[in-house]
Amino acid sequence: MKKLLIATSLVLLSATAWAQKSPTGNAGFDGLDKNRDGYLSKEELAGDKEMAKRFAKFDGNKDGRWTLDDYIKAHKNNDARIAADSTITTKVKTMFLTEKGIPSTSISVQTYEGTVQLTGTVESKDQVAKAGKIAAGVSGVKKVDNKLAAK
């Protein structure tokens, strides 16, 4: 009985240790904060391309390091970019599906920061041009990188 009580106590204590929160309560921030100073430097962000790209823009007080608040704002900005790019990609694909003469299943569409990239192989140069024109006409598209090839 005594052994069972000790074993149960150890399990409960270890579960409590596992339940400890990270220093800021944000696992993403804390995982990047290698030196555990409560800030993120540009070097600490180097492994996260999207966050590193946003470093200068979201360094609120321009001290060369991010607070948790800076990190959260940059993350929200990146999440909004992803949502906007996904919406554009969906709209372009939908336009291709509804347009006669466009082999939609032969065209890959990717969007990054409003730039749409078209890849794949279609039957003719006319289809290449038409697909590019359709993509360019979609709301939110800033640029079309048309890499479609004609057979």
Q: Which residues does each PLM region occupy?
A:
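N-terminal targeting leaders
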Residues: 2-12, 16-151
